[in-house]
Amino acid sequence: MKRIVMMGDEVCSDYCPVLAALLKEDAELWLAPKPVATSVDHLVGVGEWVLPRQPEVAVFASGILDTRKICFGENERLVPLTAFARNVRCILKMVLEQSTSTPVWITMPPVDVRHVKSESEFGYDNETISLYNEEAKAVARMLGVAVIDLYGIVKAASRADSYRPEGVRFDGRGSDYNANAIAVRLREICAKA
């Protein structure tokens, strides 16, 4: 049975119980004990949770907090795009160079703009999220790392009845859908790891 260490934000925490149940025949899923909000937190988590455990697969579910505006009316982000790309590269290289684990990057899902209270309150927008995701995917491709495109999965399944109360986290049905889609890809990755 393969061992998977997964790090991610609250969105990841929401779908992980279902994901663990779906993978129970193929893999043991261990979720980091606290949500990992930014790429900086992922950097710390690699040393704290991935390297000591040496799982067959290390999954990094990117959170959208990196893309949050830090000042209302300005466009500066909590983690600037160039720093985000560097962090992703460092995270993936640490796993590739200091372990036998297969790293996997999961992109940030889009926000549901119908339910985000106000752009200035949350400071999230899908254009920026998409830009950060493309940067992470380019880094992963350069390093030969698998990507699970949660942004694309959610966009492709967009439905008018899909409700996220504050526009960021998913309801139970949305989390189940995400878990199912991610499980399919993780089974493929585990089979090769």
Language-model regions, residue ranges each:
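Catalytic nucleophile-elbow at a beta strand-turn-alpha helix junction centered on a G-D-S/GDSL motif
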Residues: 1-17, 35-38, 65-67
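A short, Lys/Arg-enriched amphipathic alpha-helix followed by its capping loop at the start of a domain
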Residues: 15-27
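Alpha-helical cap/lid subdomain in secreted, periplasmic
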Residues: 22-25, 41-193
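A short beta-strand-loop structural module common to alpha/beta enzyme folds
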Residues: 26-42
